[in-house]
UniProtKB/Swiss-Prot annotation:
Protein name, entry field: Chaperone protein HtpG
Family: Belongs to the heat shock protein 90 family.
Source organism per UniProt: Shouchella clausii (strain KSM-K16) (Alkalihalobacillus clausii)
Residue span of region B: 342-551
Keyword Ribonucleoprotein: no
Presence of keyword Nucleotide-binding: yes
Residues covered by region (C): 552-625
Gene Ontology MF term list: ATP binding; ATP hydrolysis activity; ATP-dependent protein folding chaperone; unfolded protein binding
An example Gene Ontology CC term for this record: cytoplasm
Record-linked CDD domains: HATPase_Hsp90-like
Region (A): 1-341
Annotated function: Molecular chaperone. Has ATPase activity.
């Protein structure tokens, strides 16, 4: 028996790998299974050039056994095995990858690829084991060898007995400590869960004896527990199958199996790309909004596989924030991984995949909107807000990608419509896309400022969500048509000459100046209205900050008291206006009373808080008595 030291020169390097490279101890099983899969792959490639070998896939498998009594976890494979020299080279040298060397020497075809590339995965075993024993026999040798190490004081190699070609790895699982329990890695349910999580799509069967309950042979009314060998992994990933082979039910089953949601997917997108970068993806748009979607706890991201092995559960870089509702997975053979295979190097390949996925999602949504509007409306009610946030965020950088996906309720169509639909119906000579804001469609329809615009035949889009107007401010225009709020102080709408005369008369100017003085800075201006028909009063906003935006900003923490510049508009054709003129001429106190009442009434209509509810109540009583 030979005792040797690791060629990486230091015990500290191994400790660093075990304790720092991997973030989760359960990863060790993924690494060992990947190595076993590589060993079988090498056998396959060898058979392509060696006529004396035949590769019958059914003969090749990976076996996992747990021995709780002796605290051992055993893995066996029927792969190519290792010679003594390969044991020294691959297991005696940290960060020496036999699989990487094999890839460089072998032309990889037929859709196979070798998983391993760093030569450190094997050492992940020392995260859970205080001793590792490897017995292996190479296809090139009649002699088997035993490699053994405690991960601290070098390793030993000695001849061993093994009839078949392949490798057996025995992990002597650590004893529990106050901080860590290692018993779980000997539990059947835990081992199965780790295999399903990381290695479900390894191309060779991963077999394990599992406990099953069956009726007794002599008494079917009584059950007994038996050991039964089962294949734990699925092996054939759905994403590598032809789309023509799959039904909607297959995608739904995959969605449920992966626990992407409790609902059914509303839509799936199956992507297979074989170009500058090769990857497969299955993406899902959920039917309903996840309960935590708009909370800080929600994590976006797609599952990321490298050659069928799960690398990341949520790769956030693959999805833009505005498509964060998308679930699914991506599998690629072309990714540059870091040394632990747990994370990606942020390289060109990842960016290319992310860009392509974004394009696929956008294209699918546009197709749904055009061909299945009812389904799209269902999607939009669940996730439309996120698209609007996407328009608003990053200073509108993504508006061109998203503007055609937006829907708003239409005053004339009585349903959700796209901006493209609105523009196609615009009246001849109409220069603006008109919109109104409020808490609900019903309340918006009753707003004073919508009455005249609607009566003149203009379609109005209803904005009922906080983000709507912020998003539109970033859009600014659509198809060269600017957006205009019906509450805007400079609303572009025709008025008759008589109304213009009322507005510009010297007598009215004095009245409005007096009312503005009474309100003492609460409004920027008082004037007659061009948009009121049956309502007496209305508050318009002058400037970039609208009244709806003021409400949203005021509700935020640290709001810095941002307010819209308000203009009080009076309907010159309403009896109230005549009462104001009479009070101006005869009773200054009454004018003050009327002015404050009208201002507070306008605040209430807009859903803004009264500055002094007690005073408002007292003024109402004065009018009544």
């Amino acid at each position: 028996m030979e005792k040797k030291q690791f060629q990486a020169e230091s015990k500290r390097l191994l400790e660093m790998m075990v304790n720092s490279i991997y973030s989760q101890k359960e990863i060790f099983l993924r690494e060992l299974i990947s190595n076993a899969s590589d060993a079988i792959d090498k056998m396959y490639y060898r058979s392509l050039t060696d006529d004396s070998l035949s590769f019958e896939k059914d003969r090749y498998a990976i076996y996992v056994e747990a021995d709780k009594d002796n605290r051992k976890l055993v893995m066996k494979d029927t792969g190519i095995g290792m010679t003594k020299e390969e044991l020294e080279a691959n297991l005696g040298t940290i960060a020496k990858s036999g699989s990487l060397a094999f890839k460089k020497e072998t032309e990889i075809e037929d859709g196979h690829d070798i998983i391993g590339q760093f030569g450190v995965g094997f050492y992940a075993a020392f995260m859970v084991a205080d001793k590792v024993t490897v017995i292996t026999r190479s296809i090139d040798s009649d002699q088997a060898y035993k490699w053994e190490s405690d991960g601290t004081d070098g390793y030993t190699i000695e001849p061993a007995e093994k009839e078949d070609v392949g490798t057996v790895i025995t992990l002597h699982i650590k004893e529990n400590t106050d901080d860590e329990s290692y018993d779980e890695y000997l539990e059947e349910y835990r081992i199965k869960a780790i295999i399903k999580k990381y290695s479900d799509f390894i191309r060779y069967p991963i077999k394990m004896n599992v406990t099953v309950s069956k009726p007794k042979e002599d008494n079917e009314d009584e059950y007994a527990e038996y050991q039964e060998e089962q294949t734990i992994n699925s092996m054939v990933p759905i994403w590598r199958k032809n789309k023509s082979e799959l039904k909607d039910s297959d995608y739904e089953q995959f969605y449920q199996d992966k626990r992407y949601g409790f609902d059914k997917p509303l839509e799936h997108i199956h992507v297979s790309v074989d170009g500058a970068i090769r990857y497969n993806a299955i993406l899902f748009i959920p039917e309903h909004t996840p309960f935590d979607y708009y909370s800080k706890e929600y994590e976006k991201g797609l599952e990321l596989y490298a050659n069928g092995v799960l690398i990341m559960e949520k790769c956030a870089e693959l999805l833009p924030d505005y498509f964060s509702f998308v679930k699914g997975m991506v599998d690629s053979e072309d990714l540059s991984l870091n040394i632990s295979r747990e994370m990606l190097q942020h390289d060109r390949q990842l960016k290319l995949i992310a860009k392509n996925i974004k394009s696929k999602i956008k294209s699918q949504l546009k197709t749904m909107l055009k061909k299945e509007p009812d389904k799209y409306e269902k999607f939009y009610k669940a996730f439309g807000r996120q698209l609007k946030f996407g328009v608003y965020n990053d200073f509108g950088a993504n508006k061109d990608d998203l503007q055609d996906l937006l829907l708003f309720y239409s005053s004339t169509e009585k349903k959700l419509v796209s901006l493209s639909d609105y523009v196609s119906r615009m009246k001849e000579g109409q220069t603006y896309i008109y919109y109104a804001t409020g808490e609900s469609n019903e309340r918006i329809a009753k707003l004073p400022q919508t009455e005249m615009v609607a009566d003149q035949g203009y379609e109005i889009l209803y904005f009922t969500e906080d983000v709507d107007e912020f998003a539109i401010k970033m859009l600014r225009s659509y198809d060269e048509k600017e957006f205009m709020s019906v509450s805007s102080a400079d609303l572009d709408i025709e008025t008759d000459e008589k109304q213009e005369e009322e507005t510009n008369s010297e007598e009215n100017k004095k009245l409005f100046e007096k009312m503005k003085s009474i309100l003492d800075g609460k409004v920027k201006d008082v004037r007659t209205s061009k948009r009121l028909k049956s309502h007496p009063v209305f508050l318009a906003a002058d400037g970039e900050i609208t009244l709806e935006m003021e409400k949203v900003l005021q509700a935020m923490p640290d709001n810095q008291n941002v307010k819209a510049e308000k203009v009080l508009e009076i309907n010159p054709n309403h009896d109230v206006f005549h009462s104001l003129k009479q009070a101006y001429e005869e009773d200054e106190d009454k004018l003050k009373l009327y002015t404050n009442l009208l201002y507070n009434q306008a605040l209430l209509i807009e859903g803004l808080p009264l500055e002094d509810p007690v005073e408002f109540s007292q003024n109402m009583c004065k009018v009544m008595v």
